[in-house]
From Swiss-Prot:
It catalyses: uridine + ATP = UMP + ADP + H(+); cytidine + ATP = CMP + ADP + H(+). This is Uridine-cytidine kinase 1-A. Keywords: ATP-binding, Kinase, Nucleotide-binding, Transferase. Disulfide bonds: none annotated. NCBIfam families: PRK05480.1, udk. Gene3D superfamilies: P-loop containing nucleotide triphosphate hydrolases. Residues 262-271 have a biased composition (Basic and acidic residues). Its EC number is 2.7.1.48. GO terms for cellular component: cytoplasm. Belongs to the uridine kinase family. Pfam families: PRK.
Length: 271
């Protein structure tokens, strides 16, 4: 997508943005986690042209469907959870432009008509980008762009109930939703999304309900915004370099370290 051009935007210097990938199954709470992070950082009330942290969804990069594909999509017979459904070339080009500090226009997608809209959203230079999507880690070229990778791990029954409620609000009937879930969504998650969990630096069970994990991530982003971008890379935060137990609700977690995965989950929740 072409750059939006030169606009009156505050200068941010030449430091490259810190890219954070957020993945997980459909309706796992990825966007909610990102929005909560924005809220805790006080960025949700900042003018979008001056935000230090921005969110971008992989959903913006669905391919333009052919007439035949759109007909199948309207019947719930098109697999939107398959890697081929995404325009990875446009996605990579957009992320590259963001890394270069450019102002970029990103597509908008209509989930009711299953079509890319002519309107675009402008993303202005920021210090941190949260990029969320079901297959954010699937493509290696894109995965390697993230300096921190988070995986939101939510029970399948919870994800299904959320998916049903969300899609019914989009005007779809229950039978079509369930058929699409069993035919495309669930198999695609197991084949394409779940295996990418191994690439995550941090695993967040229960999504936004896991405030221990959210607060830890917010603290790391705050360190980045304060200019100490290498703090987590050094593997030393106040002398803590190994996993530790967080107080409250039986949750445990660990420090984000290069090459080490942190699993922040409840020991009492069945999976």
């Amino acid at each position: 997508m072409a750059s939006a051009g030169s606009l009156d935007v505050p200068e941010r210097g030449h430091q490259r943005p810190f890219l954070i990938g957020v993945s997980g199954g459909t309706a796992s709470g990825k966007s909610t986690v990102c929005e909560k992070i924005m809220e805790l950082l006080g960025q949700n009330e900042v003018d979008h042209r001056q935000r230090k942290v921005v969110i971008l969804s992989q959903d913006r990069f669905y391919k333009v469907l052919t007439p035949e594909q759109k007909t199948r999509a309207l019947k719930g017979q098109y697999n939107f959870d398959h890697p081929d459904a995404f325009d990875n070339e446009l996605m990579h080009r957009t992320l590259t432009q963001i890394l270069e500090g450019q102002i970029v226009d990103v597509p908008m997608y209509d989930f009711i008509t299953h079509s890319r809209l002519p309107e675009t959203t402008t993303v202005y230079p920021a210090d941190v980008l949260l990029f969320e999507g079901i297959l954010a880690f699937y493509n290696q070229e894109i995965r390697d762009m993230f300096q921190l990778k988070l995986f939101v791990d939510t029970d399948s029954d919870v994800r299904l109930s959320r998916r049903v409620l969300r899609d019914m609000k989009r005007g779809r009937d229950l039978e079509q939703i369930l058929t699409q879930y069993t035919t495309f969504v669930k198999p695609a998650f197991e084949e394409f999304s779940l295996p990418t969990k191994k690439y995550a630096d941090v695993i967040i069970p229960r999504g936004v309900d896991n405030m221990v994990a959210i607060n830890l991530i917010v603290q790391h982003i705050q360190d980045i915004l304060n200019g100490d971008i290498c703090k987590w890379q050094r593997g030393v935060l106040n002398g803590r370099s190994q996993k530790r137990t967080f107080p409250g609700q039986g949750e445990s977690g660990g420090l984000i370290l290069p090459g080490k995965r942190t699993h922040l989950e409840s020991s009492s929740r069945p999976h």
